[in-house]
Amino acid sequence: MNIDPSTAPKEVKEDLKNLQTFLSQTLPAKKLDQNVLICAWNIRMFGGLTMKWESQEEDSPKRDMHSLLCIVDILRRFDIIAVQEVRGNFKCLREAMRLLGPDWSFLMTDVTKGGKGNNERLAFIFDNRKVKLSGLACEIVIPDDELEKNKAINADALQRQFARTPYAVSFQVANHTFVLLTLHVLFGKKSADREAEIQAIADWIKGWAEEMNSWNHSMITLGDFNLERGNDPTLQAFLSTGLHIPPDLDPHARTIFKKSTTYYDQISWFKNNISLQYNGGGIVDFRGNVLQNRNHTLQELSFRISDHFPLWAEFLTP
């Protein structure tokens, strides 16, 4: 059974129409040969799907056909989306790709085994009408000698740092080639205890960005960095190599629940190693703009849409 939007109940169609109006008012338009819209979205437990227009209390998972159509309408507003929390069962992803249509493609990692991996994948979804693959797709392993430079780093540092293996893919838009590196960093309860490890990882990312730049490839990192705002030592370590987080992304909440000191999702790059021109970014605050007639709590909404907002950035590509 597949989702057929034409058979959706009237209230679902009206809800989707309202969402599309909101998205048009919130996001810049996708323009061929003029811009590229990049998004990082941690979609909570993006795996199974209940094939009903509205899931009930006894249903599992809670994400239903109406919810997935909302997610797809958001996805199609971007050119490239880095998605986190794609589960081992990726029925939602398969159905989303079918709904997006033949102009869209995706790449994803294998499931990361182990408790911290949480049976999840990382994925990139992209619009083939504007975006082309340019040859590179790899899971990242940071060399041991990068960690051994600092004796304060423990032998199991990488296992603790990455819940899922970082994933890098190169894309071409117009005359610009760039690498997107998506990762999920774990810092544990005391982020200051991992400062040396984060410094080593930041140093390695900078070196790789410089290497990419020597081939006229820009590199953008995006994903769940799990950082603290302000003067937190891990944030300072990560930024110490020149990694740039756009100031206009700073004030935006990253999750639907509340503003906090955490800096979960990020889009960042090295200013000297990028050929794209940043033109602004933000979040898609879908609260109140999806599933409007259901009166869900935020917790209930998080299992149907997500607990994270889509974080986006527009780059000009003239």
Language-model regions: role of each:
Residues 1-25, 90, 206-220, 227-318:
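Metal-dependent phosphoester-hydrolase catalytic domains
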Residues 1-104, 108-121, 198, 289-292, ...:
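N-terminal, active-site-proximal structural segment of metallo-dependent hydrolase catalytic domains
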Residues 35-48, 135, 177-187:
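Active-site-proximal beta-strand elements of phosphoester/diester hydrolases
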Residues 44, 87, 184-186, 225-228:
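Catalytic metal-binding/acid-base residues of hydrolase active sites
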Residues 49, 90-93, 115-118, 189-192, ...:
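Extracytoplasmic/secreted cell-surface and envelope-processing proteins
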Residues 52, 85, 173-200:
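Metal-dependent phosphoester/phosphodiester hydrolase catalytic core
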Residues 66-76, 172, 197-214:
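Short, basic/hydrophobic alpha-helical segments
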Residues 82-174:
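Structured beta-strand-rich core segments of catalytic domains in phosphoester-bond hydrolases
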